[in-house]
């Protein structure tokens, strides 16, 4: 039996903890906040369970992970058909995109210009330096400029030509116009639009993992931010929330920039300088409570235009068949921002007015508005800026040289991955130690290289 300390109780940390526990190890999880789950948690507002934004479990989840989740949740894991919309050219188009719907709703010039882009593609010398370059090369100038460029600026806070091309390779799944056509054909069938979602909200997944881990003898300390990790040849000493613990291994899902601050011996100044150079985009989540049973029939509205503050609007009630109140609904508006900017510092009431103003601009129905609740997330979207890519690579390289301390997960790898990706990271890390005393670093390195191929699914 090996003693393992896991930092963070998001999906990556919890899956690593549960799997390592099942393999016979003594695992303790340290969570800084009062509750588990991270951004994959759910919580209650006025009797309704809501998530930290719009989330869903994709059918592309690897079979071994999907089987695990199905075992944990049973019939509470529901198969649902997506019913979203995206705003393009001041018109609503089905999302995922469907061929007939696009033809019917998008202007003729969009189809013509996109077709010309495809014809010109073989004669254009490609560049993949920036996000704008990468998307233009793959999908053409029209799709890049009308959709991806403004959406990128809205999410990451800087123009698409100042973002590294790696951001597009991580975030944009379509590789060519042909790939879009294939996706259109697939999404035109119900099976191509399905997703999985728990009856009691997205957070039911991490809750089930945590409960099983505890039932198996694992320990989770909440309200326990790790303030120091002291490494030695044979063990590590973890200080967290007034608790001191010795562990043979520390697996950290904390932001890699934070890990550089709390680990001892301290890294070189060059590593600390690199960590300080990287920026992460925050988000304000606005939950508007409405005195009506349903706002629209759609689960999510995607809003790439810079004319609105909201990047995505979701209605949690429409994601599931659950025990939700009949006489009310809640909208969740996702507003990307920088920590400390005007949006971040706004009151709940002011945020609510921003959202209501955006709804009016979009021509959405008038809402029977009651009140607004907010959640402020300081670290959501890692920003792959051209000018700091060397620093990012330096920090990631340092993170793979820490011996008994292993960073992983979205924050540990500075990536924007989906739930099934982060669950896979936790599972693979636990499998790399198996029933032995030491992590097989060769096996783990292979997994890390595989993680670099992950592409976010919307």
Please report, for each region that a protein language model flagged, where it lies by residue.
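C-terminal lid/capping helical subdomain adjacent to the catalytic/cofactor pocket in oxidative enzymes
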Residues: 386-458
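Dinucleotide-binding Rossmann-like beta1-alpha1 core, especially the glycine-rich loop
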Residues: 46-123
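Short loop/edge segments at beta-strand edges and connector loops
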Residues: 8, 79-81, 222-224, 230, ...
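Active-site/ligand-binding neighborhood in enzyme catalytic cores
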Residues: 91, 107, 116-228, 232, ...
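Mid-domain catalytic core of redox enzymes
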Residues: 23, 225-349, 353-363, 367, ...
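Glycine-rich FAD pyrophosphate-binding loop
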Residues: 21-44
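N-terminal Rossmann-like FAD-binding beta1-loop-alpha1 element of flavoenzymes
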Residues: 2-29
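Conserved Rossmann-like nucleotide-cofactor binding loop
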Residues: 12, 35, 257
């Amino acid at each position: 039996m090996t003693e393992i300390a896991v930092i963070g109780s998001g999906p990556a940390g919890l899956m690593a903890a549960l799997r390592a526990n099942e393999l016979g190890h003594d695992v303790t999880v340290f969570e800084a906040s009062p509750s588990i789950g991270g951004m994959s948690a759910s919580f209650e507002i006025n009797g309704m369970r809501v998530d930290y934004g719009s989330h869903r479990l994709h059918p592309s989840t690897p079979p071994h992970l999907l089987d695990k989740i199905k075992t944990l949740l049973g019939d509470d894991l529901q198969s649902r058909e997506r019913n979203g919309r995206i705003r393009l050219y001041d018109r609503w188009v089905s999302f995922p995109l469907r061929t007939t719907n696009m033809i019917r709703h998008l202007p003729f010039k969009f189809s013509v210009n996109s077709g010309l882009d495809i014809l010109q593609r073989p004669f254009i010398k490609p560049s993949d330096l920036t996000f704008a370059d990468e998307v233009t090369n793959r999908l053409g100038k029209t799709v890049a400029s009308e959709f991806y460029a403004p959406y990128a600026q809205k999410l990451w806070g800087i123009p698409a030509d100042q973002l590294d091309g790696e951001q597009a390779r991580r975030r944009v799944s379509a590789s060519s116009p042909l790939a879009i056509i294939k996706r259109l054909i697939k999404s035109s069938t119900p099976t191509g639009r399905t997703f999985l979602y728990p009856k009691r909200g997205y957070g039911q997944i991490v809750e089930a993992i945590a409960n099983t881990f505890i039932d198996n003898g694992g320990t989770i300390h909440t309200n326990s931010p790790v303030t120091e990790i002291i490494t030695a040849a044979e063990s590590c000493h973890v200080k967290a929330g007034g608790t001191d613990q010795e562990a043979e291994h520390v697996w950290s899902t904390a932001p890699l920039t934070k890990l550089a601050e709390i680990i001892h011996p301290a890294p070189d100044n060059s590593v600390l300088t690199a960590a300080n150079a990287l920026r992460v985009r925050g988000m304000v989540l606005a939950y508007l409570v409405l005195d009506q049973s349903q706002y629209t029939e759609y689960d999510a509205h995607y809003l790439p235009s810079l004319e609105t503050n909201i990047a995505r609007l979701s209605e949690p009630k429409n994601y599931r068949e659950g025990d939700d109140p009949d006489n009310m609904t809640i909208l969740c508006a996702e507003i990307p921002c920088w920590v400390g900017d005007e949006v971040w510092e706004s009151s709940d009431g002011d945020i609510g007015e921003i959202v209501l103003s955006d709804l009016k601009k979009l021509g959405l129905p008038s809402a029977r508005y009651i009140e607004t609740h907010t959640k402020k997330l300081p670290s959501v979207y890692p920003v792959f800026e051209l000018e700091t890519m060397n620093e990012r690579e330096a920090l990631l390289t340092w993170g793979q040289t820490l011996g008994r301390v292993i960073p992983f997960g979205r924050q540990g790898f500075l990536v924007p991955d989906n739930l099934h990706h982060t669950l896979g990271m936790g599972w693979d890390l636990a499998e790399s130690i198996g029933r032995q005393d030491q992590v097989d670093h060769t096996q783990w390195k292979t997994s890390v290289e595989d993680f670099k191929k992950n592409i976010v699914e919307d």
